[in-house]
Amino acid sequence: MASRQAPLCGLAPCCLWLLGVVLLMNASARPANHSSARERAGNREENEILPPDHLNGVKLEMDGHLNKDFHQEVFLGKDMDDFEEDAEPRKSRRKLMVIFSKVDLNTDRRISAKEMQKWIMQKTAEHFQEAVAESRAHFRAVDPDGDGHVSWDEYKVKFLATKGHNEREVAEKIKNKWDLNIDEETQEVLENLKDRWYQADNPPPDLLLTESEFLSFLHPEHSRGMLQFMVKEIIRDLDQDGDKKLSLSEFISLPVGTVENQQGQDVDDSWVRDRKREFEELIDANHDGIVTMAELEDYMDPMNEFSALNEAKQMIAIADENQNHYLEPEEVLKYSEFFTGSKLVDYARSVHEEF
């Protein structure tokens, strides 16, 4: 698989090769994902070497759920942490209006779809740069001899060490091809990781990853081949009839069983509504009711300019109360929760304060 040196031209999410993720019940049972990216965390050692289950600026999570934070990630970029729920409202409103001014390239006090598209691409590029920097640091953690290559055995030793195994003992067992005595769940995760390792290994395969290949291993959105592999895994997980395509009913499948209370019913209703809108408005490009691998790949490619434009139009439509196809300061402030994750009160009055 060739590593992508330049951003893909063809967006922005997947699969069961994730670390630590339990297999889903079956393709028709997809529970809603209630946690946001801000709430996800693992132990530090695992975070240094394991592929993340959340990719900033990618529409789908690695388990096939919609990325709940996507709009904030591509609108706020590195400023996302500044808009926490307990932030001082006036300060947050001012920051939001500063961002508005940056997106508004022609300074006409309204944001067009083209302006939003350019902003989305800029913020996505920032996430790409962050991923490269993080991957470089993590590569050093798994390349103990500093030879610029990481073997599968070297990685396996580090991985098992994060699971509580003695690093020296594991290395000795692997060297002598002795039984590692690991539990079934850990073995399954290792097999999934090895499959992913093979996919990131540029031909001719040697099970040695360079720094750029290791980036593709951790962040499949940086590699065309890994992105395609990711798409195949998603379709495999969701495809119920085996046609290697996704129908609307397959994409919005709910967990098996009856909800126990109204809150659970509301969650299910929200799951169906959000995924139906995403399927019909953004993923199914030719609107034939079927999503192909090519359509899902375009949707998941973070640097696909056409998908970024569609996303920009959808983001504007959500807050465009006067339906003029532009975003105005009042609308951005009123729908601040959508753009920032925080609800900022007194939005109308603050427009005059901040401008």
Swiss-Prot record:
Binding positions for Ca(2+) 4 per the UniProt entry: 284, 286, 288, 295
InterPro entries linked: CAB45_EFh, EF-hand-dom_pair, EF_Hand_1_Ca_BS, EF_hand_dom
List of residues that carry Phosphothreonine: 186, 210, 258, 292
GO BP of this protein: calcium-ion regulated exocytosis
Annotated Ca(2+) 3 binding sites: 239, 241, 243, 245, 250
A Pfam family matched in the record: EF-hand_7
UniProt keyword terms in alphabetical order: Calcium, Glycoprotein, Golgi apparatus, Metal-binding, Phosphoprotein, Repeat, Signal
Places the protein is found: Golgi apparatus lumen
One GO location term (cellular component): endoplasmic reticulum
Signal peptide start-end: 1-29
Positions where Phosphoserine occurs in the chain: 92
Residues engaged in binding Ca(2+) 2: 143, 145, 147, 149, 154
Glycosylated sites: 33
UniProt-annotated stretches for the region Necessary for intracellular retention in Golgi apparatus lumen: 302-355
Highest taxon above the source species: Eukaryota
Function noted in UniProt: May regulate calcium-dependent activities in the endoplasmic reticulum lumen or post-ER compartment.
Domain notes from UniProt: Binds calcium via its EF-hands.
Record-stated family: Belongs to the CREC family.
Protein name (record): 45 kDa calcium-binding protein
Organism: Bos taurus (Bovine)
Gene field: SDF4
